[in-house]
Amino acid sequence: SAASDVYKRQMFVVGNQAAVDTWGDYCYDLTGTPIAGELTTDAYNLYDADGKLCSIGYCYECYGIIVNEDLLEKAGYTLGDITNFETLKAVAEDIHARASELGFDAFTSSSMSDDSSWRFTGHLANLEYYYESVDDPDAWKECPSSIKGTYMQNYKNLWDLYINNSAVNPADLAAGGFDAADEFGKEQAVFYQNGSWEWAKLTGTGDGQYGLDNLSMIPFYCGVAGEENAGLNCGTENCWAVNALSLIHIS
């Protein structure tokens, strides 16, 4: 490893625009390189103000609402029945109303303890930021000092759907002590907000894993016009950069 001096420190992680602003002068321009040619999207690359390709995303994560399709079908629905907030709401409320009959509920718990709340104060809140950036891209070239709040009602609508269609009383969520991953893994709920990093735990068959094998993920449907065409939330701060000065020394 580089830490043990087995090889020279030539590759680094420059993972966001602030890092590019700080270290961009040291980054080799990766434009036209073989690794750049392998990419199928430019969405996760980082450029400096002059258009130099400073770093390239080498992996990314997605998050949204994970769906147990087997349970969904037991409730009488398929993934194709859910295309927007209106249809998600109808399905979730029906499942919740029949939870005793079905043996499972719509959503896992939405605990506000520190080990869970980041899913909602961070990831779910991103729907507000994203749609504001779509409306006004120039205002979001850098992080703005404030938001307009245009889509906060959409955020609230989805949050309310979570907490009102779960086996856990909303009044108890602030106290914490709930394990949404375990609830989902034990097939106690159809829907679970989380991300691709949960895949191994949910589908694996080792200790502490659940062996589920029919999972999908849907976007944060929240009632925004055109959301039928929305995709998952994807991003990364895992971006490789090459130290241009090290290449000078090599040559």
How should each PLM-predicted stretch be described?
Residues 2-7, 250:
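Short, small-residue-biased leader/transition segments that mark boundaries at the very start
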Residues 13-67, 119, 125, 214-219:
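Hinge/lid segment of periplasmic solute-binding proteins
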Residues 73-75, 206-251:
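Extracytoplasmic/periplasmic substrate-recognition and gating elements
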